[in-house]
């Protein structure tokens, strides 16, 4: 067929299949996305469609026909105990059984990335099956398991949880992660002052100094929302119900909302409520397709065997660009205040978060856990230009670490589906990991629900939720990468100041379509 006769879809597919930097599996993934996006979009009200087309609202490139939930958090403990009739597996009897069963089920857990975004609360899951094994025997098995995950499920949105208790499996995972320094899986330690011993938290801090993992979550804060042990931290720090997950994620560009506002009062009384309503309309439309037309919840063995419950999936009401919105509103009001620099601007930011939280809490959705969406400070996507992720401070001129934490902490109470701020510290912190412990505890005391740190000089760094190796970015365009998130980090490096800013990295979640 002559090139002039090729459709846009054919041209995009041709770019994918001839890409020199994608593996066959990655090409298959992107080709499937192109096919899905060739289908009609779920029916939307006119105002919602306009907001989506103008970029005031973004659907995260999830696809035009949501035939699976964005994030799935199976009840892995139930699976290990009972096995699976569908997979013809008996329950686990020892640690080898448990690890083998998990590696099988992971390949049957769907997500927006086509790989599992949640691996379970691994230490709590595996410890009952350790029995008489020595610590050395546990370490060998966990290290082998960790290497298996990185090699067969190479997606850094894949996320494991550990803590708050101290177990031999907890220590084995920390040792394996520090030694191997893998991009995948990502890791969150759930901290609880009443359960977590001081020496374990110090070990976690040493790991952060070594490989920028794990992320630390304030367990008691999440316990109040989901109840203890009934949630998981997944992907880019999304807090979601266990045995359920996140059905969809749609995000509001607050900068674009501010650009359409004539004043601060107009922003709060007219434009913000208007676009919040349009976002709920998009969420409802996408969830209607998932629940009523895709047949996922009717046919999935995960539902039939009690590993997930359709009523425990929550749509995520995302936002980003708060910093730019605040600065624009201040400028239009004739103020010199800047977000992160002045109390007036910071208070305006807190007011925006509070109004978003109030709207989400008081607006029912057609399909969702407790009939509500969950508010999420979305961490950006790799193609974002000119916006700061979530409620973060603008890049490049962040204040000292303590002021930084005190400034962003008041936002954290509002975002039940997760919020993250990346604190990048000088390499000298490696000589005093106890200082990192104190920063974390101080952040939690100030009200933060999540604590995330990168250490300057480490090759393994965090591009918000997901990890990349800096050494992989330079060679990606020539050689490609077996890890699905390297290309996202490379695109972020081109579109943002990720490699030019102060020691800290920009946060970007998944972009769902291939771009060269």
What are the functions of these language-model segments?
Residues 2-311, 332, 338-342, 361, ...:
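Conserved catalytic cores of very large enzyme subunits
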Residues 117, 309-325:
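Conserved phosphate/anionic-ligand binding catalytic regions in large, soluble enzymes, centered on
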Residues 272-276, 318-321, 326, 330:
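A conserved active-site cap/scaffold subdomain adjacent to cofactor or substrate pockets
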Residues 336-359:
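Short secondary-structure subsegments characteristic of cysteine-rich extracellular domains
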């Amino acid at each position: 067929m002559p090139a002039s006769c090729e459709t846009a879809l054919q041209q995009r597919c041709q770019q994918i299949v001839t890409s020199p930097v994608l593996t066959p599996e990655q090409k298959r993934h992107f080709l499937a996305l192109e096919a899905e996006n060739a289908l009609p979009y779920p029916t939307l009200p006119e105002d919602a469609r306009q907001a989506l087309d103008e970029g005031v609202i973004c659907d995260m490139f999830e696809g035009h026909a949501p035939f699976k939930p964005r994030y799935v958090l199976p009840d892995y403990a139930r699976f290990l105990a009972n096995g699976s009739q569908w997979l013809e597996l008996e329950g686990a009897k020892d640690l080898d059984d448990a690890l083998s069963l998990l590696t099988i089920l992971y390949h049957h857990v769907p997500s927006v990335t086509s790989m599992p975004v949640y691996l379970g609360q691994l230490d709590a899951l595996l410890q009952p099956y350790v029995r008489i094994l020595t610590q050395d025997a546990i370490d060998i098995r966990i290290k082998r398991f960790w290497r298996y995950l990185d090699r067969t499920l190479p997606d850094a949105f894949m996320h494991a949880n550990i803590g708050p208790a101290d177990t031999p499996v907890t220590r084995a995972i920390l040792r394996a992660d520090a030694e191997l320094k893998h991009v995948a899986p990502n890791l969150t330690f759930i901290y609880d002052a009443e359960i977590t011993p001081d020496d374990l938290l110090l070990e976690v801090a040493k790991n952060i100094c070594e490989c920028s993992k794990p992320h630390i979550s304030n367990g008691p804060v999440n316990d109040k929302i989901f109840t203890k042990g009934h949630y998981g931290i997944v992907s880019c720090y999304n807090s979601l119900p266990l045995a359920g997950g996140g059905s969809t994620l749609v995000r509001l560009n607050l900068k674009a909302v501010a650009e359409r506002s004539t004043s601060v009062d107009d922003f709060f009384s007219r434009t913000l409520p208007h676009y919040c309503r349009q976002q709920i309309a998009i969420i409802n439309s996408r969830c209607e397709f998932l629940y009523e037309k895709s047949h996922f919840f009717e046919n999935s063995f995960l539902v039939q065997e009690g590993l997930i419950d359709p009523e425990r999936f929550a749509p995520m009401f995302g936002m980003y660009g708060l910093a730019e919105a605040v600065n624009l509103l201040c400028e239009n009001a004739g103020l010199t205040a800047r977000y992160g620099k002045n109390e007036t601007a910071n208070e305006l930011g807190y007011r925006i978060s509070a109004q978003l939280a109030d709207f989400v809490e008081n607006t029912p959705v057609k399909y969702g856990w407790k009939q509500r969406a969950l508010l999420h400070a979305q961490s950006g996507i790799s193609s974002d230009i000119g916006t700061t992720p979530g409620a973060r401070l603008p890049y490049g001129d962040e204040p000292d670490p303590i002021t930084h934490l005190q400034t962003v902490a008041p936002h954290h109470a509002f975002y039940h589906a997760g919020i993250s701020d990346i604190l990048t510290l000088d390499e000298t912190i490696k000589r005093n990991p106890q200082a990192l412990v104190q920063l974390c505890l101080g952040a939690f005391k100030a009200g933060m629900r999540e604590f995330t740190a990168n250490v300057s000089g480490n090759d393994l760094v965090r591009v918000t939720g997901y990890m990349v190796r800096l050494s992989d970015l330079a060679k990606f365009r020539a050689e490609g990468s077996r890890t699905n998130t390297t290309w996202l980090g490379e695109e972020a490096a081109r579109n943002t100041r990720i490699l030019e800013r102060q020691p800290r990295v920009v946060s970007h979640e998944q972009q769902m379509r291939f771009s060269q």
